[in-house]
Regions:
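A detector of single, family-specific signature residues
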Residues: 1-432
Length: 432
């Protein structure tokens, strides 16, 4: 069996081949389809190949995977932590990868299937267009700020806002900068609409999107972004694995007999997914329900910013439960879910249709009824947390936990059972 490491670059890849009982063989191949197919023809089912995740990794992996018995894509950050070296060349890197794979030390990356890769490209393409639009809008805002001008409209880039901008009296150079920004915005807005239309058509056919959109604050963009990053939910055995994968788990530092120190979130994984989760959390806490109650509880102790991050983490836990069970969020407001669905249909180009919802209640009455139910759930959450806190305080005062056991002290710290009791376990399963 041969073990082959590839250090991949834009135009070439350095190859190191390990064979039992022989010196390593080295070669360089071009990263063109023809050269890669010729290299793949020299491989067999007894070979195993490793390469690091880069921009062109997936195309190379797709060409080689059918010819070898085992192909691994490694995580560059974790590989560097395992095999950092003073001498770093392409040949050394390729050989190091092969040696790590032979020793079974490679931290692998999941190789997404073609539909997931296509969704990732579509989501990242839309995100890039949105960033371009934001830059253009910020340039126009900068012109107004430099000239001490306040816009009289709430939507500066709507029809009324653009008409006001075109008539605004400014110095010639500043006026031309605003006009150029508006001219550039038009095609970018059109491309964003087309990209969102294509994404919406795929989202309507994906039942996972409907499940995630049942969560308050989670729209189609957030749902698609999460699905693109997650792929198959079966990859994650429990919610904590998904939280860690998205970089919302806290950093932990512990050495010797010192207690563990928990710091800020790790920020590993997909930054775009964390961004849309934070945006969704800001929206979710404005809707009555257990999520808003949870936000208020954390905000009172840790401040608003940390509370928003805690809600984002809770959204990830909810995502794991909903996708694993195939069930919508229990406290999903039906009217809000229908509104999200209709917005998705409009983006996909589906014409409006008149539907009649059963019952004698008007739309406003249904919304008020749903709001009352959610406010009741929010109040029930607060009562649950308050009752558990009272039990924890009583247990701490008597020196016994909820099961009547006297806790064992370890170096001045309470036992895990008492720590669990003192925390109160305020979060309920996958519901908040």
């Amino acid at each position: 069996m041969r073990t082959i490491g590839l250090d991949v670059h834009k135009r070439f890849a350095e190859v190191a081949i390990l064979t039992s009982g022989a010196s390593p063989a080295r070669r360089r191949i071009a990263t063109t389809p023809a050269a890669l197919r010729a290299f793949a023809a020299t491989l067999g089912p007894q070979d195993q190949v490793v390469l690091e995740a880069t921009m062109n990794t997936w195309a190379i992996a797709e060409l080689l995977a059918a010819r070898v018995g085992h192909l691994v894509v490694s995580n560059p950050l974790r590989t560097r932590a395992i095999a950092d070296a003073k001498i770093k060349t392409d040949k050394v890197d390729a050989l190091t990868l092969a040696q790590l794979l032979a020793a079974d030390f490679i931290p692998p990356v999941w190789i997404p299937d073609p539909p997931t890769r296509a969704l990732r490209r579509a989501v990242s393409g839309r995100a890039a267009l949105v960033r371009q639009r934001t830059q253009l809008r910020n340039r126009i805002h900068g012109v107004l700020h430099r000239n001490l001008v306040d816009a009289p409209v709430s939507d500066l880039f709507g029809r009324a806002g653009q008409r006001w901008l075109s008539e605004l009296a400014l110095p010639a150079a500043e006026r031309e900068e605003v006009a150029a920004g508006l001219r550039l915005l038009a095609p970018v807005d059109a491309e964003i609409s087309r990209a969102e239309g294509r994404l919406a058509q795929g989202a309507l056919a994906d039942p996972r999107v409907a499940l995630l959109m049942s969560i308050p604050g989670v729209g189609s963009a957030c749902a698609l972004g999460l699905i693109a990053v997650i792929g198959r939910i079966e990859r994650f055995a429990r919610p904590a694995k998904l939280v860690s994968y998205l970089g919302l788990d806290p950093k932990v530092r512990q050495s010797g007999e010192r207690p563990a120190h928990t710091g800020a979130i790790s920020r590993q994984g997909a930054a775009h997914a964390r961004g849309v989760l934070i945006e969704a959390a800001h929206t979710a806490v404005r809707t009555p329900g257990p999520l808003r109650a949870f936000f208020g509880r954390v905000k009172a102790r840790r401040g608003e910013q940390k509370a928003v991050v805690a809600v984002a983490r809770k959204l990830v836990v909810l995502t794991w439960h909903l996708l694993s069970r195939g069930e919508p969020y229990r406290w999903a407001p039906a009217t809000l879910v229908r509104t999200k669905r209709r917005a998705l249909e409009r983006a996909a180009g589906i014409p409006a249709r008149r539907t009649r919802i059963g019952g004698s209640l008007s739309a406003r009455e249904r919304q008020q009824q749903e709001r009352a139910i959610l406010q009741g759930a929010e109040a029930a959450y607060r009562e649950l947390v308050s009752a558990r806190r009272e039990r924890a305080d009583a247990a701490a005062a008597t020196g016994r936990d909820d099961e009547g056991q006297r806790p064992k002290m370890r170096g001045g710290a309470p036992s895990p059972r008492l720590r669990s009791s003192l925390r109160g376990q305020a979060a309920s399963g996958g519901e908040a």
